[in-house]
Every structure is written in structure tokens, then in C-alpha cells.
From Swiss-Prot:
Cellular compartments per GO CC: cytoplasm
UniProt source species: Staphylococcus carnosus (strain TM300)
Complexes and interactors: Heterotrimer of UreA (gamma), UreB (beta) and UreC (alpha) subunits. Three heterotrimers associate to form the active enzyme.
Primary enzyme class: hydrolase
Designated name of the protein: Urease subunit gamma
Keyword tags: Cytoplasm, Hydrolase
Pathway connected to this protein: Nitrogen metabolism; urea degradation; CO(2) and NH(3) from urea (urease route): step 1/1
Known EC number: 3.5.1.5
Database matches in PANTHER family: UREASE
Family, per entry: Belongs to the urease gamma subunit family.
Length: 100
């Protein structure tokens, strides 16, 4: 089986999301890469499920809050951009202040 670089990146994101969710379920606060992985994964899956860019931009701000992440992490992510594949093509999802 051969994966393209994009497919490998998506698989790594799935693994990072899984690890971050397991740590979160143990009561640990998320670090920067873990927070980005969770939000990015949810955006990709939402696009796959057929949600619109506008819906995902709104949903992206509801996934995590400051209590979920280590101190300072929310300030490190002023904007998050995720390129996702929608039924009508690839689009860029921009989430302003994803962790509030």
C-alpha cells in the first residue's frame, strides 16, 4: 500500500488526535500540538461529513476552551487554517481565536 504525502499527513493527524484525546480523558491539559491536532481533525471530519465552511468556522471555536489547554496555549493560536476536502473541492477553513 502506498500513501501520498497528503494522505500520510492526514494519518499522522488522526494519530495525534487520538493521543491528545486519550491524554485529555485522563485529565491532562493539552499542549500546542495536541490542541491543534484535535481542532484540525474535527475540521477535516466535518468537511467529510458535508458541513459547510461557515459551519466549521463556527464549530471550530467550540471544540476547546482555555480550561482544556496549558497556560499560554490559547495565546499561541490566534488563527488556525486547515485545508479540507469538501464534496465540491478543497477549501481553506480559517478559525479566528479557536480557543476561548
Amino acid at each position: 500500500m502506498h500513501f501520498t504525502q497528503r494522505e500520510q499527513d492526514k494519518l499522522m493527524l488522526v494519530v495525534a488526535n487520538d493521543l491528545a484525546r486519550r491524554r485529555q480523558s485522563r485529565g491532562l491539559k493539552l499542549n500546542y500540538p495536541e490542541a491543534v491536532a484535535i481542532i484540525s481533525y474535527e475540521m477535516l471530519e466535518g468537511a467529510r461529513d458535508g458541513k459547510s465552511v461557515a459551519e466549521l468556522m463556527s464549530y471550530g471555536r467550540q471544540i476547546l476552551n482555555k480550561d482544556d489547554v496549558m497556560e499560554g496555549v490559547s495565546d499561541m493560536i490566534p488563527d488556525l487554517e486547515i485545508e479540507a476536502t469538501f464534496p465540491d473541492g478543497t477549501k481553506l477553513i480559517t478559525i479566528h481565536h479557536p480557543i476561548v
